[in-house]
């Protein structure tokens, strides 16, 4: 009985060593992270940014839909109005220590101003540094939708142009002529 147990023990040890050595020469799955970039899928939800129109103006019209859609309430903003009647956020703040990167704010945004990028390197040593203001979130480009301009598409009156002169807008209909 003792000899059989010794033979079984030696057999299991040899089998374990065989597995270890067979994996020793296989290709590695581990990456040296800072030196080699990590692949992230195209729809990966990472850092949140605020984008600009093709004209260079910020896209956000401070409609507050992103803050309402956020399940953890990490977005806060205050609406203000420019001289030409266009709305903009006086301040726009995201607390990334609370954000769960669900993407509901991006889906709720009618102007595609708020977008999630594949960037995930947002580590900070202090919690206060994870609260990003509008200046930190605003990027110089249009993001995922380079040709979209909310004010041209929406049909809102633009200074110097009457209603119906925007790119994708039909001329106004005279409603009184439709009455019986």
Curated annotation (Swiss-Prot):
Gene Ontology MF terms: 4 iron, 4 sulfur cluster binding; iron ion binding; NADH:ubiquinone reductase (non-electrogenic) activity; quinone binding
Basic and acidic residues bias: start-end ranges: 161-174
Stretches the record annotates as Disordered: 161-180
EC number per UniProt: 7.1.1.-
Amino acids binding [4Fe-4S] cluster 2: 70, 99, 102, 105
Cross-referenced Pfam families: Fer4_7
Record's bilayer topology term: Peripheral membrane protein
GO biological process: aerobic respiration
Positions of the 4Fe-4S ferredoxin-type domain: 48-80, 90-119
Keywords tagged on the record: 4Fe-4S, Cell inner membrane, Cell membrane, Iron, Iron-sulfur, Membrane, Metal-binding, NAD, Quinone, Repeat, Translocase, Ubiquinone
Main location as per UniProt: membrane
Family to which the UniProt record says this protein belongs: Belongs to the complex I 23 kDa subunit family.
Protein name, entry field: NADH-quinone oxidoreductase subunit I
Organism: Aeromonas salmonicida (strain A449)
Lineage: Bacteria, Pseudomonadati, Pseudomonadota, Gammaproteobacteria, Aeromonadales
């Amino acid at each position: 009985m003792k000899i059989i147990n010794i033979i079984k023990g030696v057999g299991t040890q040899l089998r374990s060593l065989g597995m270890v050595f067979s994996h020793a020469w296989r290709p590695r799955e581990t990456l040296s992270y800072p030196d080699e970039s990590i692949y992230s899928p195209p729809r990966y939800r990472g850092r949140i940014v605020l984008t600009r129109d093709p004209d260079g103006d910020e896209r956000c019209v401070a409609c507050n839909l992103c803050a309402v859609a956020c399940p953890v309430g990490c977005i806060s903003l205050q609406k203000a109005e420019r001289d030409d009647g266009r709305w903009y956020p006086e301040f726009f703040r995201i607390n990334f220590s609370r954000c769960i990167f669900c993407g509901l704010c991006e889906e709720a945004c009618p102007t595609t101003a708020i977008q999630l990028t594949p960037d995930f390197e947002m580590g900070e040593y202090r919690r206060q540094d994870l609260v990003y203001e509008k200046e930190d979130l605003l990027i110089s480009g249009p993001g995922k939708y380079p040709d979209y301009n909310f004010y041209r598409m929406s049909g809102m009156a633009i200074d110097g142009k009457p209603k119906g002169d925007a790119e994708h807008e039909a001329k106004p209909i005279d409603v009184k002529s439709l009455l019986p």
